[in-house]
Amino acid sequence: MRHGYRGRRFNRTTEHRKAMFANMSAALIKHEQIVTTLPKAKDLRPVIEKLISLGRTDSIHARRLAMAQIRDADMVKKLFSVLGPRYQSRPGGYCRIMKAGFRYGDNAPMAVIEFVDRDVDARGKDSGPTSVETAEAA
């Protein structure tokens, strides 16, 4: 029996799961809307709700806690400068999950997770994999 266990394991180690949710949180803060599988979206919601609640109180301690969770300095800045003030008067429920059909290939249920009152212009194309520029000998 799995009574009292919260969350899913997603067939990943604890470190991998934490890194996955950190990356998904950073992507959601950056684009304000992402498409993922429904179970991942359901488990991401409490993570992002707690981060937005941290963003509502701008303090050094809150910034350090957010940085420990997200690990992306630019997204922490956006969290405290844009998202925190936007949801200052809202007591909770900062994001919504909408079902988006099934993925072709493995028929996994997909979902769109987005911020309530989101900025439509913030959603952009995926930046793709980042590469390190190498210094060429001139």
From Swiss-Prot:
GO cellular component: cytosolic large ribosomal subunit
GO biological process per UniProt: translation
The keyword GTP-binding is assigned to this record: no
A molecular-function term among this protein's GO annotations: structural constituent of ribosome
SUPFAM superfamilies reported in the protein's UniProt record: Prokaryotic ribosomal protein L17
Keyword set, alphabetical order: Ribonucleoprotein, Ribosomal protein
InterPro entries: Ribosomal_bL17 (IPR000456), Ribosomal_bL17_sf (IPR036373)
Organism domain of life: Bacteria
Keyword Plastid: no
Similarity section: Belongs to the bacterial ribosomal protein bL17 family.
Binding partners and assembly: Part of the 50S ribosomal subunit. Contacts protein L32.
Stored HAMAP family: Ribosomal_bL17
Protein name per Swiss-Prot or TrEMBL: Large ribosomal subunit protein bL17
Classification lineage: Bacteria, Pseudomonadati, Pseudomonadota, Alphaproteobacteria, Hyphomicrobiales
Gene name in the database record: rplQ
